[in-house]
Amino acid sequence: MQDLNALLERSLGQLGYELVDMELANRGKLIRLFIDKPEGINIDDCVLVSNHLSNLLAVEHDIDYDRLEISSPGLDRVLKKTSDFVRFAGERAQVKLRMPIEGRKNFLGILRGVDQEYLVLECDGVEQRVPFSNIDKARLSPEF
């Protein structure tokens, strides 16, 4: 899977896209990719990437799949890389931890930035410094 991830990141990067997330379902027969670029993506981007990657994966004989889905990450996109937390500073996010801090594993707050190996998250007016190594899942949580 790391080889596939590296192949996809490299190929998408050459096209000007970022691989936000990848899901494998149906025992790896479905590859679902979430892509983005700074100005956002539309259906034409999804079609372009789908065609490009279908051709690329056809050449890679060791990648066995039946279906490829390309999608935008959505308004509640996942946050995985340090650069995601920097890019979306000032936005509201839901963060789930591996190990509790002050008895809590789930936090909803405003992303305030990154301090070396820590995410700075403001919850109820109090800043929490959360080690990136302790983050299980994080995603934007926009208010409507």
Curated annotation (Swiss-Prot):
Coiled-coil annotated residue ranges, if any: none
Entry's Gene Ontology cellular component terms: cytosol
Keywords, sorted A to Z: Cytoplasm, Ribosome biogenesis
A GO BP entry: ribosomal small subunit assembly
SUPFAM superfamilies: YhbC-like, C-terminal domain (SSF74942), YhbC-like, N-terminal domain (SSF75420)
Pfam families, sorted: DUF150_C, RimP_N
Compartments it resides in: Cytoplasm
Main location: cytoplasm
PANTHER family: RIBOSOME MATURATION FACTOR RIMP (PTHR33867:SF1)
Function field: Required for maturation of 30S ribosomal subunits.
UniProt protein name: Ribosome maturation factor RimP
Native source organism of the sequence: Methylobacillus flagellatus (strain ATCC 51484 / DSM 6875 / VKM B-1610 / KT)
Gene that this sequence comes from: rimP
